[in-house]
Amino acid sequence: MYWLGIDLGTSGIKAVVIDETGKVVSMGYAEQNVITPKPGFAEQSPEIWWEVCSRAVQTAVLKGNVNSSEIKAIGFSGQMQGIVMLDSDGNVLRNCIIWMDQRAANEVKDIEKTAFRTGVNTLNITANECLPTFWAPKLLWMKKHEPEIYERIDKILFPKDYLAFRMTGEMAAEVGDASLSFLLDVPNRKWSWEMFDMLDIPRTFVPDRLLESTEIVGELRTDVAREWGLEAGIPVIIGSGDQIANGIGTGIIREDVMGASIGTSAVVFGCSGKPFIDNNKRAIQSLCHGTSDLWCYLGLSLTAGASLKWMRDVIFKDKKLEFERQGKEIYDYITHIASKAETGSGGVLFLPYFNGDSAPNNDSDARACFFGLSLSSSMPELCRSVMEGVAFSLRETIEVCRQTGKTIDTIRVSGGGARSRLWRQIQADIFDASIVTMGVEEGPACGAAIMAAVGSGYFSSVVEGSDAIVRIKDRIEPIRENVKIYNEYFHLYRSLYANLKTSFKERAALIR
């Protein structure tokens, strides 16, 4: 008996087949690119998602020599906050404006003014402060800047829900993804028509069905099943956003467990029995978890793993091509170079703000930079400073959580940043916490498969499914001497943003 988990990421799409023990039987992966038409803009083509998804699923099914009749359900994990706009025939109207896009910063200000004028307490309704990455400001941006497309919108979908629509012909939204629309009543897990009306957004834009993460959106269409080598009629479970799915896939389903994931972005993730509402405007996001009696919270560093990818593509461009020809992994080489630097990278600090910063600074104008370079600075120090800078950005959110009284002494890590032992040690030392990795590396896809198993009736709940499948693999303890060094550098790191904030805004004004 198998379940298929599909993870729609930013850099690519993974399809993972797992069995009832949690063993990954096979995996398929296909890459895709981000389109950046202007500074601060980030888009992807939903049509290309579909092509990439098809390749990933076909690879997983063929590679594992899986009997298609034994795949009992399909579940989703997907990048969050993207908005797919469809016309009345279900055709895509334009590229998806994805989660890292910052174009709607001015619309956030407009929303805040409207809420103040009308007396609507948006924080109590949505459990979030408004961010430019959310649906609501993106829709207002569309109305203002692309009215000819806005007027043709019939339905809007989240990225994973678009794939589910293509697979089943059925449209639905899901409470986890919808939590970051700024249109959901997060405490009550339902659309807030008050928010729609306040912002003059048509209620008809959203699908008629709003589901929990383990509910069935529809059945796999015959033509899709034939193309993918699967059985027609397999139940398709709507799943949830990638961070929620990763939480399920790494066992973050109780209040005393916290996780950190480094992929294209990086996230600190925890859960609670009620929405985590941050009154201090630090962009800590509150969402409905994958089970109806839990909520989760996260702090996002927008371009964390993308920072190392930038190093790969720009600084190590020639080496990348050489390694590709040899069939070797360039990230292992970069990590090896970084390991030659001392703790603290010789005083070189890196701010990972290539496309702005979310938590806790909430600044779309912030940009990446190296600080402390001298003529003696070396490539190992540059590489290590990027890894340290990403960990420092996550520690900022961890400190916000600690200030609320949460005890954080163990963190479950996942994503690309968990594969490097050096990076795990850096995280342990900077977070001053034990770093734990799980037996299944593909957390979001595994979480999607667990939701599929729950939705198809094999497990009675997400908690039961996660407990049955997720296992601890490795633990790294912080090195006390390094913790002391990093505490001092963290103080300097935090001061850099404060001192550069005005300069970031001046720079943004110059290039607009």
For each predicted feature, which ranges?
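Glycine/Thr-rich phosphate-binding loops that ligate phosphate moieties of nucleotide
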Residues: M1-Y29, I35-T36, K72-T114, E148, ...
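Glycine-rich phosphate-binding/catalytic subdomain of phosphoryl-transfer
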Residues: F41, R55-Q326, Y333
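Divalent-cation-assisted or electrostatically stabilized phosphate/pyrophosphate-binding catalytic cores
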Residues: S45
